[in-house]
């Protein structure tokens, strides 16, 4: 018969093992929110922090600038401006509560972030309610806010970097929504009228097209009572407008020259990429970082200049973009080396050192973003926006990428058309590219080649004298 002491020790060991196994599970699920849904379809995520004096409200509306009408880019951004048009409202959040209120419009979504004091929760929700349900779309207010956005766009100096980024997007996508700036242009915003904004408000700003996250020192019971009362009346849409558009036409393969005065030249290359929900998205991120490192190694002069490669992913397939600041003397060589890097990614597997460096850099950057107080809800909000089956552990997905994944995705992306743009002074750029690459100058009508006409024969004069 076993002694009680030995049985007690054995039981203690079992309990300890269970505790050790359960610990990572608890750590993984402790950050998961409590979920609720109002009768109008508004999805709720609760991240309680008992005793925290602050509260963060993050409302994600799953429609963005991709739905701007043709020739009216900036329409959804302008609608975002109209949600909280009174400067006193913004001052209240910054001055009175030491927080902030902002509206961010991307191609895929409109996100309202409100940071304030937990004891002012009811008032914060009331401000949100007024912006969503009682949006002031009077002719006078629309004119005032539209003029303010146009002035902001005109007064904001567009750097050569932004010119190149916009040009490569337009070159790759043409008239497709991702080819125009989400913030709009002065000319396009001026075309947006009140009827456009009212229609966009009715189509997209609906309760069942949104998810609200509450993070901080507010109990779920208190929050539910307030949300039912103030956001319960928010109108539900009969049908969610799907993100479907006619596919863009094949892009022009000639290098586009954009005339921009300045001492440097901005070089861009791009290919059609993957969507945010694509299982290859994390692989494309690592692929981009490996591409950047190979380009830097092939062109030592880039080490002292801004250089990047990135995978831009949206609800629909985005773009794989490489870019650097070069000179008109080195632009042809830099373009050639970038193309060689693209070829090498399809034929030469990434080394273990390349993979480790890329994954470590990306993981560190992502960790820095996710540790911000108002970023706790982002994986769950993204899951709704991009129709993911579950919130993604992006760091774990990055770390699982291997060399064969990189080569497979490189062949998937780069077997399609790769486009290029150079932004700088056009005269030296034309001289630099002449004889190396076919090019087109933006806004310049190509001079037609002279026609080869046979020489005119002299008339035969048979008139008698």
Q: Where do the language-model regions lie?
A:
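An aromatic/glycine/proline-enriched structural segment found at the starts
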Residues: 174, 182, 207, 211-275, ...
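Bacterial N-terminal signal peptides
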Residues: 11-23
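Acidic/histidine-enriched segments that form metal/cofactor-coordinating
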Residues: 95-200, 246, 340, 355-374
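M16/insulysin-pitrilysin zinc metalloprotease superfamily fold
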Residues: 85-86, 115-147, 311-369, 445-450, ...
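Bacterial N-terminal signal peptides that target proteins for export
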Residues: 1-14
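C-terminal regions of mature proteins
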Residues: 28, 211-216, 248, 357-465
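Short acidic/His-enriched helical or mixed secondary-structure segments at domain edges of catalytic enzymes
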Residues: 148-167, 246-264, 301-302, 348-399
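M16/MPP (pitrilysin/insulinase) zinc-metallopeptidase core fold and M16-derived inactive scaffolds
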Residues: 58-118, 158, 180-181, 290-306, ...
């Amino acid at each position: 018969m076993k002694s009680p002491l030995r049985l007690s020790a054995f039981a203690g060991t079992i309990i300890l093992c269970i505790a050790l196994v359960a610990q990572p599970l608890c750590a993984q699920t402790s950050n998961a929110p409590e979920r609720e849904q109002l009768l109008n379809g508004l999805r709720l995520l609760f991240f309680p922090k008992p005793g925290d004096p602050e509260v963060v409200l993050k409302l994600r509306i799953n429609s963005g600038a991709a739905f701007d009408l043709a020739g009216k880019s900036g329409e959804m951004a302008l609608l975002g401006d109209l949600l909280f048009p009174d400067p006193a409202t913004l001052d209240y959040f910054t001055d009175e509560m030491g927080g902030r209120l902002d509206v961010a419009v991307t191609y895929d979504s409109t996100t309202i972030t409100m940071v304030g004091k937990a004891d002012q929760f009811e008032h914060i929700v009331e401000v949100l309610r007024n912006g969503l349900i009682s949006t002031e779309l009077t002719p006078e207010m629309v004119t005032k806010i539209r003029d303010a956005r146009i002035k902001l766009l005109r007064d904001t100096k567009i750097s050569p970097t932004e010119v190149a980024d916009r040009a490569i997007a337009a070159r790759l996508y043409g008239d497709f929504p991702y080819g125009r700036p989400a913030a709009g242009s002065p000319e396009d915003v001026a075309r947006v009228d009140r009827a456009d904004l009212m229609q966009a408000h009715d189509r997209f700003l609906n309760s069942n097209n949104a998810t609200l996250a509450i993070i901080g020192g507010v109990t779920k019971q208190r929050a539910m009572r307030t949300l039912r009362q103030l956001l319960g009346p928010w109108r539900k849409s009969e049908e969610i407008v799907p993100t479907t558009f006619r596919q863009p036409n094949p892009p022009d393969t000639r290098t586009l020259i954009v005339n921009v005065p300045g001492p440097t030249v901005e070089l861009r290359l791009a290919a059609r990429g993957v969507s945010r929900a694509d299982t290859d998205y994390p692989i494309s991120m690592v692929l981009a970082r490996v591409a950047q490192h190979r380009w830097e190694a092939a062109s030592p002069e880039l080490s002292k200049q801004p250089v990047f490669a990135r995978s831009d992913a949206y609800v629909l397939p985005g773009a794989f973009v490489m870019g650097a600041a070069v000179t008109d003397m080195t632009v042809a060589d830099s373009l050639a080396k970038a193309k060689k890097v693209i070829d090498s990614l399809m034929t030469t597997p990434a080394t273990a050192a390349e993979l480790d460096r890329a994954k470590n850099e990306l993981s560190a950057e992502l960790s820095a973003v996710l540790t911000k107080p108002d970023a706790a809800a982002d994986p769950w909000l993204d899951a709704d926006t991009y129709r993911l089956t579950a919130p993604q552990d992006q760091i774990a997905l990055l770390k699982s990428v291997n060399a064969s994944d990189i080569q497979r995705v490189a062949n998937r992306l780069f077997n399609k058309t790769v486009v290029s743009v150079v932004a700088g002074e056009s005269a030296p750029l034309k001289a630099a590219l002449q004889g190396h690459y076919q090019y087109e100058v933006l806004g310049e009508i190509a001079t037609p080649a002279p026609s080869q006409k046979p020489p005119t024969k002299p008339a035969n004069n048979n008139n008698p004298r």
